Amino acid sequence: MLQCLFFVMDPVFLSEITVELVKHSASDSDVVFSARVSTLGSFVAVTDCLSNRDIGLITFLMRERHGSPFEHSHMTFRISAPIFVFREFMRHRIASYNEESGRYKNLDPVFYIPDEKRKLVQIGAPGAYKFEEGTSEQYGLLIEEMKELSLAAYDTYKRLLACGIAREVARMILPLNLYSTMYVTINARSLMNFLSVRTSRANSAFHSYPQREIELCADRIEEIWKGLMPETHAAFEKQGRVAP
């Protein structure tokens, strides 16, 4: 019964996705020495200074899709996003995930609402559709309904907990726009696979049409990764954003 005493936050509505790099072992040199062990054995020198030959090797590996050398770079991200984004993210069974638990802690009343840049109207059939701007009336209705339902659901959640109902049962009432937090650990090869389908770029060999919210998440991750492994990222771009 004490769990009902731990609600200290007022409800918050946000329109952003946050991504933070927690730790990493990721550099372009990881790719180089991992690949060269194939021909040089234990005589591979590990260095962060890349030669033109090293950069050429990275490009070759990407172009010919020799992927395993890209698996030796790892990154751990802390991500805060609405639950529906995580459900899409975790379809990529190529990373390690640990998420905030609604069984073991009271969930905070932080909810996602789209900003005014979010296109609202779907035109066309599944697999061949596009999104267009909605009207101000549609946007106003959406935000009003989302806020009202989010607050009502959270009030019910608190009442259920106050009556002694277990967290893992009470959480069933909460909506998908509730924010959660997770840690994701992923290697560079798997990350490129994720980016190839969760971002939309004109230079992609295979065009993808991700939901806007997970693309916002992917964009932030890619910007961090680009800073860690710029030559690998450049090769990824050059080869049409196809994961090796």
UniProtKB/Swiss-Prot annotation:
Keyword annotations from UniProtKB, A to Z: FAD, Flavoprotein, Methyltransferase, NADP, Nucleotide biosynthesis, Transferase
Molecular functions (GO terms): flavin adenine dinucleotide binding; NADPH binding; thymidylate synthase (FAD) activity; thymidylate synthase activity
Assigned EC number: 2.1.1.148
Subunit structure: Homotetramer.
Cofactor(s) listed: FAD
Record: residues binding dUMP: 88-91, 99-103, 171, 198
Assigned protein family: Belongs to the thymidylate synthase ThyX family.
Pathway per the UniProt entry: Pyrimidine metabolism; dTTP biosynthesis
GO biological process: dTMP biosynthetic process; dTTP biosynthetic process; methylation
Cofactor notes: Binds 4 FAD per tetramer. Each FAD binding site is formed by three monomers.
Domain of life: Bacteria
Motif placement: ThyX motif: 91-101
Residues bound to FAD: 68, 91-93, 99, 187-189, 193
Catalytic site: 198 (involved in ionization of n3 of dump, leading to its activation)
Protein name: Flavin-dependent thymidylate synthase
Residue intervals of the ThyX domain: 17-239
Catalysed transformations (reactions): dUMP + (6R)-5,10-methylene-5,6,7,8-tetrahydrofolate + NADPH + H(+) = dTMP + (6S)-5,6,7,8-tetrahydrofolate + NADP(+)
Protein purpose: Catalyzes the reductive methylation of 2'-deoxyuridine-5'-monophosphate (dUMP) to 2'-deoxythymidine-5'-monophosphate (dTMP) while utilizing 5,10-methylenetetrahydrofolate (mTHF) as the methyl donor, and NADPH and FADH(2) as the reductant.
Gene source species: Tropheryma whipplei (strain Twist) (Whipple's bacillus)
InterPro entries, per database record: Thymidylate_synthase_ThyX, Thymidylate_synthase_ThyX_sf
